Amino acid sequence: MKKFIILLLSIFLAMSLAACGNKTDSRDSSGKTEIKDAKELLTTVWNSYEEDEKFAIASGDMTEENMTEDAPGTFGITDADELDRMLGFPAADAEKIDNAASIMHMMNANTFTCGAYHLKNADDVKSVAADLKENVMGRQWMCGFPDKLVVISLDDYLVSVFGNEELVNTFKDKLTQTYENAKVISEDGIV
């Protein structure tokens, strides 16, 4: 009987440790989540997807060094108009970020487009989030309309995702489960 209880407790301990090992929400002494850059943030979320939840993606910007398939990619921030055109990030706010990354549906960007942005100053999160929402909601869409836009903050990072409602909801859920600090700032249907 003692051996059985010890075996049971050992299995329980092993399972508990394995579950804790899947959490990536490590924080520094100030309570901020430790994230190296926007690409790492998106990669961590993308890697939390089960294989049957994933879809074909092309990521990064159109430069040879940043263009990626099947994984999040770095998006250059030097061309503010390209940030706006491809990700919906307002060109006027490009000077407020120092790092960006993206994930886009390979067949149609309106099906799923996600951008992650590191803000130079965390105090700008609310104003940039409002500008981003206004910029995406005010677009003229071609090749189909996205269903939904979600903007999420994570310390000094902003993440925006728009597209098919099911894909957007899955991403939002994965991000908020992976990073306990994540806060949904806005969640709107696109009309």
Regions found by a protein language model. Give the residues of each.
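Soluble, non-membrane globular domain cores that form compact, hydrophobic packing
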Residues: G21-T113, L119-V191
